[in-house]
Amino acid sequence: VRDAYIAKPENCVYECATNEYCNKLCTDNGAESGYCQWVGRYGNACXCIKLPDRVPIRVWGKCHG
């Protein structure tokens, strides 16, 4: 498990406005919790706490969406 920005298959973050949206997205994918990181490295993006290794995360490189 790891704390990370959850990613779509094309290495793009899930953009967000609320913590509730991200918490649901993250917990639905097996994380302990989630939050909306405002004005972070990838803009307003969902970050997950203790996200399982099987779930894709945002890695270095371009978003191909």
From Swiss-Prot:
Residues 2-64 form the LCN-type CS-alpha/beta domain. PROSITE patterns: LCN_CSAB. SUPFAM superfamilies: Scorpion toxin-like. Keywords: Disulfide bond, Ion channel impairing toxin, Neurotoxin, Secreted, Toxin, Voltage-gated sodium channel impairing toxin. Expressed by the venom gland. It holds the Pfam family Toxin_3. Disulfide bonds join 12-63, 16-36, 22-46, 26-48. InterPro entries: LCN-type_CS_alpha_beta_dom (IPR044062), Scorpion_toxin-like (IPR003614), Scorpion_toxin-like_sf (IPR036574), Scorpion_toxinL (IPR018218), Scorpion_toxinL/defensin (IPR002061). It comes from the Eukaryota. One of its GO terms (cellular component) is extracellular region. Coiled coil: none annotated. It is found in: Secreted. CDD domains: neurotoxins_LC_scorpion. GO terms for molecular function: sodium channel inhibitor activity; toxin activity. Gene3D superfamilies: Knottin, scorpion toxin-like. GO terms for biological process: defense response. Has the structural arrangement of an alpha-helix connected to antiparallel beta-sheets by disulfide bonds (CS-alpha/beta). Binds to sodium channels (Nav) and inhibits the inactivation of the activated channels, thereby blocking neuronal transmission. Belongs to the long (4 C-C) scorpion toxin superfamily. Sodium channel inhibitor family. Alpha subfamily. This is Neurotoxin BmK-M3.
